[in-house]
Amino acid sequence: MGKSSKKSVTEVETPASMTKPLKKGKRDAEEDLDMQVTKKQKKELIDVVQKEKAEKTVPKKVESSSSDASDSDEEEKTKETPSKLKDESSSEEEDDSSSDEEIAPAKKRPEPIKKAKVESSSSDDDSTSDEETAPVKKQPAVLEKAKVESSSSDDDSSSDEETVPVKKQPAVLEKAKIESSSSDDDSSSDEETVPMKKQTAVLEKAKAESSSSDDGSSSDEEPTPAKKEPIVVKKDSSDESSSDEETPVVKKKPTTVVKDAKAESSSSEEESSSDDEPTPAKKPTVVKNAKPAAKDSSSSEEDSDEEESDDEKPPTKKAKVSSKTSKQESSSDESSDESDKEESKDEKVTPKKKDSDVEMVDAEQKSNAKQPKTPTNQTQGGSKTLFAGNLSYQIARSDIENFFKEAGEVVDVRLSSFDDGSFKGYGHIEFASPEEAQKALEMNGKLLLGRDVRLDLANERGTPRNSNPGRKGEGSQSRTIYVRGFSSSLGEDEIKKELRSHFSKCGEVTRVHVPTDRETGASRGFAYIDLTSGFDEALQLSGSEIGGGNIHVEESRPRDSDEGRSSNRAPARGAPRGRHSDRAPRGGRFSDRAPRGRHSDRGAPRGRFSTRGRGPSKPSVMESSKGTKTVFNDEE
């Protein structure tokens, strides 16, 4: 009782002092409207209490409590004697116990219900609040309480009838109704707030409010702005009810209301906003504050509070734990995935290395396989013939045999010469075996009669010098001979027939080509014949007669060299014509053989040779080459 008396003293002193600064500092224009409504309600409540005092016949004890309540309303303005305060403390002690019950959301007990029945007759305002909460709990004790309250006043019964249908409406709509309602009876506002909560602790809150005087209901409506101070909780339980009606309007956050309803299963949102508003969202703190308050009231209420609060806490904790576990699982999955990826990468990298190693081995094998093919020159040049170039013009067969004596036995030496018997400067040397020919090839570049001998395999086709000689070693392949000296007066077809018939004795003739002049269409005096066999025999026909002229047969060279050779030799018969001719192309064909100064006077007027000072040889060669090029294009 000593603790409760202290609470009663603080309840009387603090309301007026705490409400003013909080209103100034925290309330908006919307709060000022609420204060005007509460002031009107105070006056109306006082009038209703005075009317009901005359009408009701209640025991003196109850009247004294109601008179004390009316006096407590006046104490906020004019402080009365300590004797009245003591009487209030006795009635307010019950308020403290009931308010403790409110903080610790506990299920209703029959004893506080009976107290509420006796206290409901004290004032209409408190009774109406009791009637509002009673329909929420569907228990017989609540029904008995409703009966006693209905006998107290007709307004209470009407309010009870209203609570049942309103119970099933949404909480947000009920809050709006509480804000907008400025009726004479607080029952209408209380009736609407109760269904919004739908919890058992609201009934005990109403009990505590009914046991308190009108002072609690009227004066507490003003200090509602102190929503975030635990001191207001200790002052009055009725103050919590009125202040709770206004605090939800200020918050206007459905999320916080839902959280408060879940965390405080047995306590109302109004109590949580006024009692534990500093931590409305903190569910654990609200429950802890509720437990010590429940211990002051009764141990049974504390147990009920713990059961209900514990029943609703695990979902939130489970949700958090589940979220944490899900995060951990996701992180673990990611880490496992990364590890798997790394392993897979490592596995992928190693096979690549193995593959590369295998490829290297294969490459080595391939290179080894290619190595035996390097001496293919010997196999390809299995012919025993070498081409010897840059030979001295005074060389003889004996000189060549002595030169290659160290390499091996020389079987044959074929030196190329012109028609007049002059040596061309190259020849072919045949050895007894390919090995001897390869050994002789190593002597390439050595001096022979003052000249560096150029040696190469006859069948090798790398350079223009060895391409022609190499054809001698090709037995089955077709080879070409160059024929000149036949009469050019014959037609092209006639010349081809005579040549084919003449050389068919040696072997099979595959092709006969007779170059002609583009302008006249006449033969140019030479031809090319391809033979698959009898090449050597065809060469022996050199000097024979065809078409009234002696022919010269030799091995064919590349067409460029043939052209040069034909241009050099053609003037032998046509020199008189070209020498005195006015046509520049013909005069230029044989200009190489003529002295350099012979055609200088003729070329001087053109200015072609005056600047160079080299004579007419070079320009005449260019002109002749142009003519021959056009002719060979026709061949192809």
Swiss-Prot record:
RRM domain location: 384-460, 479-558
Gene3D superfamilies the UniProt entry points to: 3.30.70.330
Its biological purpose: Involved in pre-rRNA processing and ribosome assembly.
Tissue distribution of the protein: Expressed at low levels in flower buds.
SMART domains noted in UniProt: RRM (SM00360)
Domain of life according to the entry: Eukaryota
Keyword tags: Nucleus, Repeat, RNA-binding, rRNA processing
Subcellular location: Nucleus, Nucleolus
Any single Gene Ontology cellular-component annotation: nucleolus
Molecular function (Gene Ontology), one example: RNA binding
Protein name: Nucleolin 2
Additional note from the record: Disruption of NUCL1 induces NUCL2 expression.
InterPro entries: NUCL_RRM1, NUCL_RRM2, Nucleotide-bd_a/b_plait_sf, RBD_domain_sf, RRM_dom
Basic and acidic residues bias: start-end ranges: 43-63, 76-89, 104-118, 224-238, 342-367, 552-566, 579-604
Compositionally biased tracts (Polar residues): 368-383, 464-481, 622-636
Subunit composition and interactions: Interacts with THAL in the nucleus.
Major location (coarse): nucleus
GO biological process: rRNA processing
Region of interest (Disordered), ranges: 1-386, 458-481, 544-636
Bias type Acidic residues, positions: 90-103, 122-133, 152-163, 182-193, 267-278, 299-311, 331-341
